[in-house]
Amino acid sequence: MRQSELIRAAYEGKNTLVIKNANVVNVFTDEIVRADVAVYEDVIIGVGSYSGENEIDAGGAYLAPGFIDAHVHIESSMVIPSSFMKVIMPHGTTTVIADPHEIANVAGAAGIRAMYKLTDELPLRVLFMLPSCVPATPFEHSGAKLVAEDMEQFMHKSRCLLYTSPSPRDRQK
């Protein structure tokens, strides 16, 4: 959906859904306000006073944006990503920023590829940070060895958020 379409829908009042009488949690202003929320298709286009053909009365229930877990090791939960999602989404977390360092220690790049594949179709939005090297220190012994250059294959994936520059140890090679 294009931004111009959303702007037009908001301007013309083309709401596909209006959630009435909600206590809207504004995480930017640290306020809770009683308001209606206008939705066009699957995007919120306004908060204020709205009406529409398809209305839901929230009855004062709280309406908050999805929470973002800024750093998580999904594999440390000892469950697959879909099971992890079933536990966290009912509590409001809709996005996680995962560091697949644990699985990279064991399975290398194949483990990171597996994490991408296992999270491709989930309703949970999973973004990835990339470890700069595996193992984390030269004193560790794990199932795999990766340096920053090995991470290049993941750098341009749409869900890759962060790439750490090579460590001084890697630059000397």
Protein language model features and the residues they cover:
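Histidine-rich, glycine-flanked metal-binding segment
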Residues: 1-18, 23-66
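Divalent-metal coordination cores built from histidine and acidic residues
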Residues: 5-8, 85-165
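Short, conserved beta-strand segments within well-ordered enzyme catalytic domains
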Residues: 18, 38, 67-69, 73, ...
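Divalent metal-coordination and catalytic microenvironments
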Residues: 22, 42, 60, 71, ...
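Short loop/turn motifs at secondary-structure junctions and domain boundaries
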Residues: 27-30, 77, 142-144
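Acidic active-site catalytic centers that drive phospho-/nucleotidyl reactions
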Residues: 57, 69, 170
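Di-metal (Zn2+ and/or Mg2+/Mn2+) metal-binding site signature of metallo-dependent hydrolases
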Residues: 61-83
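Conserved small/polar residues in nucleotide/adenosyl-binding loops
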Residues: 164-172
